[in-house]
């Protein structure tokens, strides 16, 4: 085995790209059906009312409405509160 590194070899110089995870729509924001609410690894946030969960644990809106974050039984839930339409 060589006891000295060869010319210009290095064990450094590698890094993975950032995955752009996190909350994408915050509490009180209006969203449409299908909009991504949270990108995550694992279920840091759990789906609540009108929220679906993708195969990579991404949470998305199933219906249009306002985003709401609540804590229930030590779980952080994301709900979509549908907008009530007022008949005039």
Swiss-Prot record:
Family matches, as Gene3D superfamilies: 2.40.50.100
Alphabetically ordered keywords of this record: Ribonucleoprotein, Ribosomal protein
Bridged cysteine pairs (disulfide): none
Domain of life according to the entry: Bacteria
Keyword Ribosomal protein among UniProt keywords: yes
GO molecular function: structural constituent of ribosome
Keyword Ribosomal protein applies: yes
A cellular component term, taken from the record's GO annotations: cytosolic large ribosomal subunit
Protein family (similarity comment): Belongs to the bacterial ribosomal protein bL27 family.
Classification via PANTHER family: LARGE RIBOSOMAL SUBUNIT PROTEIN BL27M, RIBOSOMAL PROTEIN L27
HAMAP family hit by this protein: Ribosomal_bL27 (MF_00539)
UniProt name for this protein: Large ribosomal subunit protein bL27
UniProt organism field: Corynebacterium diphtheriae (strain ATCC 700971 / NCTC 13129 / Biotype gravis)
Originating gene: rpmA
